[in-house]
């Protein structure tokens, strides 16, 4: 090969080499494979909201305000206890006549409705520690001559169906006595007393005193009788719900210990209770 040919060969080779180098430099790098997605932790389950059945026609324990909200002594006490126990609750207006069926069927987790702790009820449901002391009381018109429970034997007596007032009057007059007039609520029975449809009403002292004080035009008076045994209210739960029962008892004990219970009691009844409602239930109000 002549020197000229050699020089051309080298130039051509150099150009080819440079082209190959540029092509190699211009090649894009392949993208690295994307990392496998990391499984996210499951979202925490929402906190359970316990359904509380209450017959909101029993002031001052439970009633509805002008906004339709359920308010009252029971509501404040159990709301405060639930907060202490770290549980969420929701009150649902539930007619008294079906309230325990709703509990038994699981439609309600608890019943808070001035429910008296009785041996009969304890056979089918569990109760929290008592939170209110009650007793039956007679309401009559101011001019009535009734001075004791036995005076009602020949009179027309109004009661709320299925309450301990109903039980007491049934024992005195006989369960099927036509002189016993049964109503869906105690306020309805008291309205009937005001209009003259019945001669007396027997019901829990708290609701009777509240109604009489707020209806001065009815010209009522109240009559106490030692024959009426003390009663206590408790929170009713489905039989065997021991975990919820323990939490509620914990909450009730806490609000009694820190003074919250006394504050609520004074709000509704004008003064703190004479004694705490923490003794065992002694008898078979609402």
Label every model-predicted segment.
Residues 51-54, 150-165:
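Short loop->beta-strand "edge-of-pocket" segments that line small-molecule binding or catalytic clefts
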Residues 34-37, 43, 140-157:
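Flexible hinge/capping segments at coil-to-helix
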Residues 164-181, 219-223, 252-286:
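Ligand-binding clefts/hinges and TM-proximal coupling segments of bilobed small-molecule sensing domains
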Residues 115-123, 170-171, 194, 199-229:
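A ligand-binding cleft/hinge motif common to bilobed small-molecule-binding domains
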Residues 64, 78-85, 165-184, 212-217:
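Ligand-binding cleft/hinge of the Venus flytrap
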Residues 56, 132-140, 209, 213-250, ...:
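Periplasmic-binding protein-like
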Residues 44-114, 258:
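Extracytoplasmic small-molecule ligand-binding "clamshell" domains
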């Amino acid at each position: 090969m002549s020197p000229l040919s050699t020089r051309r060969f080298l130039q051509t080779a150099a150009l080819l080499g440079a082209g190959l180098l540029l092509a190699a430099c211009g090649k894009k790098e392949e993208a690295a494979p994307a990392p496998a997605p990391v499984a996210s932790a499951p979202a925490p389950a929402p906190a359970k909201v316990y359904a509380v059945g209450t017959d909101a026609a029993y002031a001052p324990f439970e009633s509805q305000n002008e906004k339709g909200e359920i308010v009252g002594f029971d509501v404040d006490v159990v709301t405060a206890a639930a907060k202490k126990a770290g549980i969420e609750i929701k009150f649902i207006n539930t007619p008294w006549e079906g309230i325990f069926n709703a509990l038994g069927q699981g439609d309600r987790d608890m019943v808070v409705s001035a429910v008296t702790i009785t041996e009969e009820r304890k056979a089918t449901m569990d109760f929290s520690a008592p939170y209110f002391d009650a007793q039956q009381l007679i309401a009559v018109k101011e001019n009535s001559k009734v001075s004791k429970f036995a005076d009602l034997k020949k009179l027309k007596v109004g009661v709320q169906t299925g309450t301990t007032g109903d039980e007491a009057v049934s024992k005195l007059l006989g369960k099927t006595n036509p002189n016993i007039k049964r109503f869906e609520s105690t306020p309805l029975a008291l309205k009937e007393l005001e209009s003259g449809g019945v001669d007396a009403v027997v019901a829990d002292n708290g609701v009777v005193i509240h109604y009489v004080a707020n209806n001065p035009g009815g010209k009522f008076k109240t009559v106490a009788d030692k024959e009426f045994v003390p009663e206590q209210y408790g929170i009713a739960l489905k039989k065997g719900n021991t975990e919820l029962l323990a939490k509620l008892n914990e909450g009730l004990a806490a609000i009694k210990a820190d003074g919250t219970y006394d504050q609520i009691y004074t709000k509704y009844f004008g003064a703190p209770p004479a004694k705490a409602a923490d003794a065992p239930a002694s008898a078979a109000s609402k």
